[in-house]
Amino acid sequence: APLGNRGYCPSRDGGWGMAECYADGMGGYMERANHNTLLLPQCETMGCLENIDEILGMDGVDGIFIGPFDLSIALGIPGDFTNEKHINAVAHVLDVCKKHGKLSIMFCGGAEAANGYFKQGFDSVTVSLDISVLADAMGDIVKKSMA
């Protein structure tokens, strides 16, 4: 049985129901999923920020993923990532992750910001969105084509 609530769909995400990990049926799948799936709550609200120590202290929580845009909105400083309130909130979450030995993951918009977050001590940084990367690449192709 799954820990918590888990669905299953034998499509792409479920290996079309034919992946090697499903060879011993749903019981085997659930057992592996219970042990091989990361649980990463997103820190995007004041509630999460105010309870981050308790959240990261929970068994089964593997780390935190910070959503900086929504967090900045919750802090009352939409999109102002250089604001001291945002900087301090992000540093606090990172410190609590380190205290509990949990993963710290940050989202950012580009390579320069990613470099800064890695230097700050984050374990992983998600850079940009697939659609943004594709749009930037296509824009570059159009500019070069029209030059």
Predicted segments, located by residue:
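Conserved anion-binding
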Residues: 1-59, 73
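C-terminal helical cap(s) of enzyme catalytic domains, especially alpha/beta-barrels
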Residues: 1-4, 131-147
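Glycine-enriched alpha-helix->loop->beta-strand junction motifs that scaffold or abut catalytic
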Residues: 1-3, 57-63, 119-125
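Surface-exposed amphipathic alpha-helices with a cationic face
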Residues: 30-33, 91-99, 142-146
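Hydrophobic faces of well-ordered beta-strands that scaffold small-molecule active sites
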Residues: 39-44, 64-66, 104-107, 124-127
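Conserved, mostly hydrophobic/aromatic
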Residues: 55, 67, 117
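Glycine-rich phosphate-binding active-site loops on the catalytic face of alpha/beta enzymes
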Residues: 64-73, 122-140
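Glycine/Thr-rich beta-alpha phosphate-binding loop at enzyme active sites
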Residues: 66-87
